[in-house]
Regions:
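Patatin-like phospholipase
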Residues: 1-247
């Protein structure tokens, strides 16, 4: 159902209205934030002249997720879900696990500088990946076993045309990559699909991304089964129970 629905979405006017094909041209950046930096940079003067804080309205993203999500509240889900977002006023991580699922997912996907942020009380809420690129730490106390998926792009030596913008962008990339690597260490299993170092918005490569993701997961199956078996042992269960009680 998920794959079929997503393919329908890629052919819809809703998808075209998001403008993802215009995000990155030429030299693609790598991390979730720097991936959008090129787009923001190209329109910087225009945005500043209008005193704007985003390129596309939040409602466009909400319309897209309204089509993609089969349910609209956390309570309707068969498997519990934690959704994260970031308050860029304080840097605090916002975790949503009940109530309006659609609103939570939209907040978690609001790329700063591209999608309109959510203003609530004194908070300015944007993409969860800003403060927590991979939310293993959120799930660790709640589950017995964690599987993370690493789809970050590699740092490649492409700083031939050195300038201030490239230096700032590469500095952000290095910091993001190091943070993500440390976060991933908390996972029991890490699945690393071959994304061919392509930008995540290259939806024309959906079939390759899907195939490579399935392949990477299948390669990890023996390790997953082995570690799950050990994880379910009485001693490990007792240790996890004790750790949770002492948090």
């Amino acid at each position: 159902w998920i794959e079929k629905r997503f393919r329908e979405f890629l052919e819809s006017k809703m998808f075209k209205g998001l403008g993802t094909e215009r995000m990155v041209k030429g030299s693609d950046p790598h991390s979730p934030i720097s991936q959008i930096a090129k787009k923001v940079h190209d329109q910087f003067v225009f945005i500043m002249s209008l005193n704007k804080t985003f390129i596309i309205k939040k409602e466009r993203l909400k319309t897209a997720f309204n089509f993609l999500l089969p349910v609209k509240t956390f309570e309707e889900l068969k498997i519990p879900l934690q959704v994260t977002a970031t308050d860029i006023q304080t840097g605090e991580i916002q975790v949503y696990s009940s109530g309006d699922l659609l609103e939570a997912v939209v907040r978690s996907s609001s790329i700063p500088g591209y999608v309109e942020p959510t203003f609530q009380d004194n908070k300015i809420i944007v993409d969860g990946g800003v403060g927590l690129p991979n939310p293993v730490s959120i799930l660790k106390p709640l589950v017995d076993f964690t599987i993370a998926v690493d789809v970050k792009r590699k740092i490649v030596p492409d700083l031939a045309d050195l300038n201030i913008f490239e230096i700032l962008q590469r500095s952000e990339l290095v910091g993001y990559t190091k943070l993500l690597d440390n976060l991933l260490k908390e996972a029991d299993i890490i699945i690393k699909p071959d994304i061919m170092n392509d930008h995540w918005s290259h939806f024309n490569l959906f079939d390759k991304f899907l195939t490579n993701g399935i392949s990477a997961a299948n390669e990890q199956l023996p390790d997953i089964i082995s570690k799950l078996s050990k994880s379910n042992s009485w001693s490990n269960r007792f240790k996890r129970w004790f750790d949770q009680k002492t948090l």
